[in-house]
Structure formats: C-alpha cells, structure tokens
C-alpha cells in the first residue's frame, strides 16, 4: 500500500527527472518498444534506486507474486523507468525480453486514461469449449488504471495501451523488470 504522501514523493522525483526525457519520435524502429509516449527507459537504468521506499515495496510485492506463481527469479530488479502519456498517446503491444516478471505501478491517472491491456498469445484459446468468457480465458484482458495500483505479470506476456488513445491530460506509470 502506498500512502498519499508517498505518492506525492514519487511524483516529485519524477518531476525532478522529467527534464531528461525526450519525445521518442523514433518509436517503432525496433520490436521492443513502440508508441508515442515519453519514457525515461533509455535514460534510467534503475529509476527505483531514486526512491528507496518504493523499491522496497516493489521487492516485497514481487516476492509474494513469485511465491504464489512459482516463478524462479534472481531477486534482482534489472531495470526500472517511468512513462508519461499525454493526451492522444499510446504504447503499442510489446514484451520485456531478458526478464522474468514485469510490473506497472500507476502514479497518475484519471477516468480518461487509456486502459492497460494484456494479449494472450495462445492461438488455441479460441478453439476450446468455454461456457463463459472472462479475464481467465479471453484473448484480450483490460485493466482500468487507478493511482497506487501495482500490476505484476510475466515479462513474455504482450501488453500495451494502444487499443484506445489516452484521453487523459497525463498518465504516469513507473515500470520495472525483475530478473
């Protein structure tokens, strides 16, 4: 759980580091990260190092996720960064190669923020007998972002926010990869 005071501290650290961002007009030049959002991904190898209490929370949440899911990981955050999506921005469907678990912590969102989606890459999903479609058996899963929400997922799982353009004035997410 992140308090409102801690959320403000996270926003302050992002604000101090925002000057290093550049608008990536070249997104789409590789298969890893596509879209038109601003990101500290290329500038920050480990953004969480700037916010020790948040790094500790991420470790604790990931440790519990690993315990419940049975993943074998090295107990090390490989890299972390923040993304800022302004109005009409998106992040195309992508994965996080070279890591085991990835996470997205929503810092600033509102009712107009684009949803986070996950895509089930199993082509057989549509050939099984399913009585009821839900988030456990559907090809696409959508999450409405809310501030202070942490979502953990396997790094191989395709995800993004491009199915709907962001209509919020600003959507801020801290992301990380766990090795």
Predicted regions and their residues:
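Active-site region of the double-stranded beta-helix
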Residues: 43, 48-78, 86-100, 107-111
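A short hydrophobic beta-strand segment most commonly corresponding to one strand
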Residues: 103-105, 168-179
């Amino acid at each position: 759980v992140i308090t409102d005071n801690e959320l403000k501290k996270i926003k302050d650290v992002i604000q101090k580091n925002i000057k290093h961002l550049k608008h990536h007009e070249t997104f789409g030049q590789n298969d890893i990260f596509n879209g038109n959002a601003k990101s500290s991904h290329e500038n920050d190898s480990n953004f969480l190092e700037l916010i020790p209490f948040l790094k500790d929370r991420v470790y604790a949440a990931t440790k519990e996720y690993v315990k419940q899911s049975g993943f074998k990981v090295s107990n090390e955050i490989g890299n972390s960064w923040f993304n800022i999506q302004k109005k009409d921005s998106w992040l195309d469907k992508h994965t996080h190669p070279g890591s085991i678990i990835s996470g997205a912590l929503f810092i600033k969102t509102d009712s107009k923020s684009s949803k986070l989606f996950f895509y089930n890459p199993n082509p057989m999903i549509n050939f099984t007998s399913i009585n009821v479609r839900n988030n456990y058996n559907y090809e696409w899963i959508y999450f409405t972002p809310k501030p202070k929400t942490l979502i953990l997922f396997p790094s191989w799982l395709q995800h993004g926010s491009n199915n709907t353009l962001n209509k919020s004035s600003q959507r801020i997410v801290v992301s990380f990869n766990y090795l």
